[in-house]
């Protein structure tokens, strides 16, 4: 029998008989590894434990205690779910199953009746029966014709078979457990009995293949773990996530809403939400002006030719709204980006090196055609206002400008008490270069400049291929969300392309024309996404300087204490404090509880003693104790809180 060479993560090499499996390789290393092994990765591709290996390659043994080990478990649990549904609902049709960040799902279409969460008990019971039966899970291959015969009558599975066969030269990979066959090449465990701890979570709608033009299917979500304590921790995390969900808090605090009569992804900002947004906007404008940015206003509409020249029409068209034909040959486009507009600002005057760096900024409204299935509250919308800026600089000032922008970003993060983030250097995908501007020298030069700036500042970062913009590499700041995910909040992008496409120039110290470099930067993303992020981070309890209502004043008796309350509220409002007066005919305890429910930072109670002594009784949000102090003392406390961005000294 012929042999193959297997390379291990420590670069050691061993020979095995051709046809050896990952399970056998794991066992050859140690019995304990074999017990923990759930799959393998050969040359970076998943293989199941029993899949014969016929060629030389590098291998990684995937174990239960790894993230990849969880992925294999979740894929298997999704199959067990589909098998259970197949037994319970014989006429059910099946879309696709997959893993999520924290579990799995399977899409289904049941013409007889919709699956509800009340059905989860019987579905879970059937899953437990399949798990207890410990059915072996076998990898099988079919021709396209054979696979189509197996799934005949299920149009979703038929379409899936054709897609898979088209990618795999007419071959279709599937996994079989008992009589159930799942069309997938996603690697799974060796038997159903290895899925011991699972829970079904929710059911929602999802378009087939994510396209709104396709039928709406039911998506059943679940999660699974190898240990009960890990499932318990995940359920606690999800409970916390529900409590922090900005859509839930936004409704409770009346921050925003989306009206289906108006359109998906087009939020209305209610007074409370608008107040938070206004404070953020004023803060960011003042901060950027202090750092040398000049703010502008530019049109939300532009001639389509502007975006053809910039390259957005070629590279970004699917995320843009259709152009508007004005009937006279002019085509107008809702802008998806602000950079071409800021280039027009730069080009409006002849520029000198003495003006550089020229830093243009705007809170610019944009429109992007997000698919309806991707829209989420404020975090994914179709109309958004981006905190955007573009620096036009001399080429030999790149590293200095990058450092300046990173310092600005970290100062802003500090003011908002954002601490859990990391830097990502985002490069183009060298295996898929057609997605990007074709200039290898430019890419190498710009990527090295970003890396040098980060290294010089001593910042830790990780590198990611395929995450660059089409015109250049970037530094992304990946923030940890309160719900356990990660998203890009800030970005700094280096661009040699657009200055060339728009023929940007400046007169250098030598009196000659030179080409500037353009730096795209966004510090706090869009107002929509940043507000969603902060709402979840603060759990709706905004710091005093951001809170829509900063002080709630409650008179004990309206007929005796309102003059004092009105005088106090007027003086606080004169200093820009956002004050509410709760003079409703309700019990005192109820009004105090409502102030806590509304997460108002300071509640003041005014009764006979306070009026007589010129004092206020203060209760801070989240605290049971109260403090009585003079009005001047409270004013100083409040102002210091606001001026210090509510940070503890």
Curated annotation (Swiss-Prot):
Domain named TGS is located at: 1-63
Against InterPro entries, the record matches this protein to: aa-tRNA-synt_IIb, aa-tRNA-synth_II, aa-tRNA-synth_II/BPL/LPL, Anticodon-bd, Anticodon-bd_dom_sf, Beta-grasp_dom_sf, TGS, TGS-like
At the top level, the lineage of the source is: Bacteria
Recorded catalytic reaction(s): these are: tRNA(Thr) + L-threonine + ATP = L-threonyl-tRNA(Thr) + AMP + diphosphate + H(+)
Instruction: Provide the residue positions that the database annotates as binding Zn(2+).
Output: 339, 390, 520
* Known cofactor(s): Zn(2+)
Mind listing the GO biological process terms from this record?
threonyl-tRNA aminoacylation
**Main localisation, per the record?**
cytoplasm
Has keyword Iron-sulfur?
no
> EC number(s) for this protein?
6.1.1.3
Give the span(s) annotated as Catalytic. Answer: 245-543
Any idea which UniProt keywords this protein has? Answer: Aminoacyl-tRNA synthetase, ATP-binding, Cytoplasm, Ligase, Metal-binding, Nucleotide-binding, Protein biosynthesis, RNA-binding, tRNA-binding, Zinc
PANTHER family noted in UniProt: THREONINE--TRNA LIGASE 1, THREONINE-TRNA LIGASE
Q: Which NCBIfam families match?
A: thrS
Alphabetized HAMAP family for the sequence: Thr_tRNA_synth
Q: What task does this protein carry out?
A: Catalyzes the attachment of threonine to tRNA(Thr) in a two-step reaction: L-threonine is first activated by ATP to form Thr-AMP and then transferred to the acceptor end of tRNA(Thr). Also edits incorrectly charged L-seryl-tRNA(Thr).
Q: How does it assemble?
A: Homodimer.
User: Which family does the UniProt entry place this protein in?
Assistant: Belongs to the class-II aminoacyl-tRNA synthetase family.
The name on file for this protein is Threonine--tRNA ligase
Gene that encodes it: thrS
